[in-house]
């Protein structure tokens, strides 16, 4: 079940086009899901990818698939740090930042807007979304774009193509291990 969801919702992260992806599943058996997550992480970790839970709410579970090295690079950006400090973050190691994000997700029904940083959205678009209350965007795709519409449109097209190719390959029997691109060499 989780493998199919990863292909459907996180193909660009598996393909190393995005630092992170997120999806929710409802009605998931907790113990079975934990076993499947452990099994998937044994497969994904050597390739520099981690699957974790951000929030459980009733029968729904919010998952986050990410590349820690790429998230670390984003969190090392001084602009991202300044923004996240204003949101209550003090430690910018990926796991520490994820702990704060999990806590903020647990505070209410909605998503804290900084979640876009963890998904690889441009900081200018995250800030634009907040300033405009989600209105007046230049382009709407994987996220609402407020800065570079041309560059974002190119990314959206790459993500769309990636999802199509990954879905086709997975349906034809290609295993997740082959569809997960390894981490960049250090």
Role assignments for model-derived ranges:
Residues 58-59, 97-101, 130-133, 140-147:
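Short linear loop/turn motifs
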Residues 111-139:
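Hydrophobic/aromatic-rich, well-ordered segments within soluble, folded domains that form packed cores
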Residues 86-113:
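Internal catalytic-core helix/loop-beta-alpha segment
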Residues 45, 131, 135, 164-168:
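Generic secondary-structure signature for well-ordered alpha-helical cores
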Residues 18-20, 59-61, 112-114:
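Short, surface-exposed beta-edge/turn micro-motifs
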